[in-house]
Amino acid sequence: MLKINAKLGGTNFGFDVLLRDSYIKPRTMIMGADVTHPGAGSTNVPSFAAVTASYDEDFFRYHMNWRVQPPREEIIADLKEMTKEHLLYYYNHSEKEKPNQKRPQYIVFYRDGVSDTQFAEVKRKELAAIQEACKEVAKQYKWEEDFKPIITFLVVQKRNHARFFPVCPNNKTPAGVDPKQGNVKSGFVVDTIITHPWQIDFFLVSQNAGKGTACPARYRLLFDGGIKINELEIKRMTFYLCFLYARCNQSVSYPAPTYYAHLAAARVKLYCNNKFDDIDTSAGRDKEEIYRDWKAATDRVNDETVKNMKTFIDNNPMYYV
């Protein structure tokens, strides 16, 4: 029922107003991004990028868009256009009355699936794409010239080898810890010793692991918009976003917008199943030419989806959950 309600435009839960106003500034758009890749050995299937963005004050509803990518390409190639679509969707669905209050003043971007060696490239290319999107939307739709949302860019790393256990002096189980599991409590944070010495870098165990050992997610701040951002606010905002995943009434292992981006990328991969079988991907063909053929095929898939489901998608933008 939780999933169905979210698909049909309902709200399962949201931020407590006091918590929301304490840790998230007004007119904030929270985005999540992920790229799904083909299986090992697949040469005739591209990667798919999906980006989600909140458009309500409860940070429960997220608009989604997607693009095809060259195989194994982690940098989101068309992030600028995708961000422009999200900015316009946020503006058109804002509950504010004044036009200047319908534009996001802050953007928090959670980027999934990036390794340490890709940090510099992702920051250089994807951050620039978001900034260019804001600039072009402001110019095209005659928003104020100084429309420059403050961007907070965070990387989410789900796959890591860190595991944490509560200290048990004299073999006594600490209060609140299940003796059968031995996991730390939900909300446990490690931000010293094994993290970066001066950048905002922390591990967060946000979920209650029912079985086995809880796996933490690691978060690294790559850009803070030129302002001295409060580290505690980032940690709490990240933790609370883990409670807003529509399918579950408990906290999950990483923030809902990133989770949704992962679901969306997997869904569009199914949309395009068997759509690339007739495309020549032999070694002799130019890679750009192959990519254009892939893009044309996915454009047809997108057109068919919109044609068949336009009214449903317009009324239920979270159909992909």
Task: Tell me what each language-model feature is.
Residues 1-321:
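Long, contiguous domain-sized segments
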